[in-house]
Swiss-Prot record:
This is Transgelin. The keyword Cytoplasm applies. One of its GO terms (biological process) is epithelial cell differentiation. Its main location: cytoplasm. The modification Omega-N-methylarginine is found at residue 183. Keywords: Acetylation, Actin-binding, Cytoplasm, Methylation, Muscle protein, Phosphoprotein. Belongs to the calponin family. InterPro entries: Calponin-like, Calponin_repeat, CH_dom, CH_dom_sf, SM22_calponin. Actin cross-linking/gelling protein. Involved in calcium interactions and contractile properties of the cell that may contribute to replicative senescence. It comes from Homo sapiens. Induction: Overexpressed in senescent human fibroblasts. Pfam families: Calponin, CH. The modification N-acetylalanine is found at residue 2.
Length: 201
């Protein structure tokens, strides 16, 4: 954390590649959504990766965000009156957000690790988590999402089909198109191409 030195060599290359994945246009969209979803009292961060990290680092804004997606009376994360100043309390607040986001439906592969945000290791992963959360909120369409629905992609939803017993029986008598046909093209009347191979001793 505070006493971690700069990375060199291969570690530096890896960190550089991770930092290049950060999308500044996406940052603007996420900031707009968080402000609309949570209210203007959350403030606005300085532009750029570092400003975005500092804004979200203590976990309070993230907790307010996930709470705003739930109805009153069933908020999953307790938000402290005063933002926590102790490091472990801040990390605990971020961990509570991650747990609530997972309970909301964000899959584990879309989740960032606490250190990704806290140490600024992988802010692109933080963006991915927030995008997944926004997409889920738009898809659920339960009245708690605020903002432009075009900011996030709507996830595909399951469409189960129910068949009656008679429909299932009728389906057994249908010949599928992949089973072929006894009409149409055939080799009747065709002659072989070219002459057969001549083997002379």
């Amino acid at each position: 954390m505070a006493n971690k030195g700069p990375s060199y060599g291969m570690s530096r290359e890896v960190q550089s590649k991770i930092e290049k994945k950060y999308d500044e246009e996406l940052e603007e969209r996420l900031v707009e959504w968080i402000i609309v979803q949570c209210g203007p009292d959350v403030g606005r961060p300085d532009r750029g990766r570092l400003g975005f990290q500092v804004w979200l680092k203590n976990g309070v804004i993230l907790s307010k965000l996930v709470n705003s997606l739930y109805p009153d009376g069933s908020k999953p994360v307790k938000v402290p009156e005063n933002p926590p100043s102790m490091v472990f309390k801040q990390m605990e607040q971020v961990a509570q957000f991650l747990k609530a986001a997972e309970d909301y439906g964000v899959i584990k592969t879309d989740m960032f690790q606490t250190v990704d945000l806290f140490e600024g290791k992988d802010m692109a992963a933080v963006q991915r988590t927030l995008m997944a959360l926004g997409s889920l909120a738009v898809t659920k369409n339960d009245g708690h999402y605020r903002g432009d629905p075009n900011w996030f992609m709507k996830k595909a939803q399951e469409h189960k089909r129910e068949f009656t017993e008679s429909q299932l029986q009728e389906g057994k008598h249908v010949i599928g198109l992949q089973m072929g046909s006894n009409r149409g093209a055939s080799q009747a009347g065709m002659t072989g191409y070219g002459r057969p191979r001549q083997i002379i001793s």
